[in-house]
């Protein structure tokens, strides 16, 4: 078993199977592209369990991903994919960077979901890019871009239904995709309160990493409550 990659939140290892990788979720938490960072015991366990439940739910609703199964409290087995260097962001309600960038009021509900692409490049601080930029950078073709948008909106619909069942609102979320050896585009990485902005339907209280970004509550307690809500749906 060889360490293939280590990022801010996860480590990826080879296995004795060519078509399987092991993902280990770390206890590190970061914000502002790593400008703020801490280690919080239990954070890796929570994100692994939450992502595993959500990926299974998506699979049951026709959304394929790299996820195979949960191995332990902090580990998953996944299919190997070549990550497309784009963060695909879907926004249902204005919050975060878009309010600063375009002047939307925080909490303004969009008429329809907005899909944005951000170039995964730490040196450039993950800039917002257009479809034309993506093609100029040879990141993806027109067909790939259309597939990414379609899949992102399908995922949005399924996640909104899930959050509604938990009396929560899906404000926005960030996802990543990868390509298999045969060129199939699959959802990859994770879906957790680290990568989503989620509000309580009644109070707009955060159930996401904004409690850490803005120092408004305990990240571990917030994520545990979110996990409990997910498990209550089973």
Curated annotation (Swiss-Prot):
Signal peptide: none annotated. It is an enzyme of class 6 (ligase). PANTHER family: MULTIFUNCTIONAL PROTEIN ADE2, SI:DKEY-6E2.2. GO terms for molecular function: ATP binding; phosphoribosylaminoimidazolesuccinocarboxamide synthase activity. InterPro entries: SAICAR_synt/ADE2_N (IPR028923), SAICAR_synt_PurC (IPR033934), SAICAR_synth (IPR001636), SAICAR_synthetase (IPR050089), SAICAR_synthetase_CS (IPR018236). The lineage of its organism: Bacteria, Bacillati, Bacillota, Bacilli, Bacillales. It comes from the Bacteria. It catalyses: 5-amino-1-(5-phospho-D-ribosyl)imidazole-4-carboxylate + L-aspartate + ATP = (2S)-2-[5-amino-1-(5-phospho-beta-D-ribosyl)imidazole-4-carboxamido]succinate + ADP + phosphate + 2 H(+). This is Phosphoribosylaminoimidazole-succinocarboxamide synthase. Keywords: ATP-binding, Ligase, Nucleotide-binding, Purine biosynthesis. The keyword Transmembrane helix does not apply. Pathway: Purine metabolism; IMP biosynthesis via de novo pathway; 5-amino-1-(5-phospho-D-ribosyl)imidazole-4-carboxamide from 5-amino-1-(5-phospho-D-ribosyl)imidazole-4-carboxylate: step 1/2. Belongs to the SAICAR synthetase family. PROSITE patterns: SAICAR_SYNTHETASE_1 (PS01057), SAICAR_SYNTHETASE_2 (PS01058). The keyword Nucleotide-binding applies. One of its GO terms (biological process) is cobalamin biosynthetic process. Its EC number is 6.3.2.6. NCBIfam families: purC. CDD domains: SAICAR_synt_PurC (cd01415).
């Amino acid at each position: 078993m060889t360490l293939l990659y280590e990022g801010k939140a996860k480590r990826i290892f080879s296995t004795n199977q060519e078509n399987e990788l092991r993902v280990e979720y770390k206890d590190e938490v970061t914000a502002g592209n790593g400008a703020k960072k801490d280690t919080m015991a239990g954070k890796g366990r929570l994100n692994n369990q939450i992502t595993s439940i959500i990926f299974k739910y998506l699979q049951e609703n026709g959304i394929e991903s790299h996820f195979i199964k949960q191995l332990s409290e902090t580990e998953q087995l996944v299919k190997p994919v070549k990550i497309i260097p784009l963060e695909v962001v879907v926004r249902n309600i204005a919050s975060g960077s878009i309010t600063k960038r375009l002047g939307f009021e925080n909490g303004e509900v969009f008429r329809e979901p907005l899909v944005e692409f951000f170039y995964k490049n730490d040196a450039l601080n993950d800039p917002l890019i257009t479809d034309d930029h993506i093609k100029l950078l040879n990141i993806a073709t027109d067909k790939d871009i259309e597939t990414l948008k379609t899949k992102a909106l399908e995922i949005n619909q399924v996640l909104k239904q899930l959050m509604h069942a938990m009396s929560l609102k899906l404000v926005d979320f960030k996802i990543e995709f990868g390509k298999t050896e045969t060129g199939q585009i699959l959802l990859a990485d994770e879906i957790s309160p680290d990568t989503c902005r989620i509000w309580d339907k009644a109070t707009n209280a955060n159930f996401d990493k904004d409690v850490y970004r803005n120092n408004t509550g305990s990240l571990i307690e917030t994520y545990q409550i979110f996990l409990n809500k997910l498990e209550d749906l089973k």
